[in-house]
Amino acid sequence: MATATSQSAPTQRIKMRLRKGDTVQVIAGKDKGKTGEVLRTLPNENRVIVEGVNMRTRHVKPTQEGESGRIVTEEASLHASNVMLYSTAKKVASRVELITEKDGSKKRRLKKTGEVID
């Protein structure tokens, strides 16, 4: 008899207009108002990892004999809907729109400031 495994239903993927290296501001949660750089995007989970935001402590066991265990502080992921792209020049967070240039290339533009990102 097969054992039952608990698998969560697949989440519906949202269009993330965030890339690695973008500066974002947290708009909800305990770290609301903090800004940081996107270290990694997890598009299948609709999550991002932001530098210096949503820090978690983890206890690591020693791997070799004679080595001591340690406590590691690292960033945990945030849902992509809880962050907004941040303009460092104008110091304001804004939604993003996709525009098509005359040559056919697609760029991202901040709606509040009109600043083109890519």
Swiss-Prot record:
Alphabetized GO MF terms: rRNA binding; structural constituent of ribosome
Family matches, as Pfam families: KOW (PF00467), ribosomal_L24 (PF17136)
An annotated GO BP: translation
Keyword terms of this UniProt record: Ribonucleoprotein, Ribosomal protein, RNA-binding, rRNA-binding
Sequence intervals crossing the membrane: none
PROSITE patterns: RIBOSOMAL_L24
A GO cellular-component term linked to this record: ribosome
Keyword Oxidoreductase included in the entry's annotation: no
Gene3D superfamilies attached to this UniProt entry: 2.30.30.30
PANTHER family, per the entry: MITOCHONDRIAL RIBOSOMAL PROTEIN L24
Function: One of two assembly initiator proteins, it binds directly to the 5'-end of the 23S rRNA, where it nucleates assembly of the 50S subunit.
Family classification: Belongs to the universal ribosomal protein uL24 family.
UniProt subunit comment: Part of the 50S ribosomal subunit.
Name listed for the protein in its UniProt record: Large ribosomal subunit protein uL24
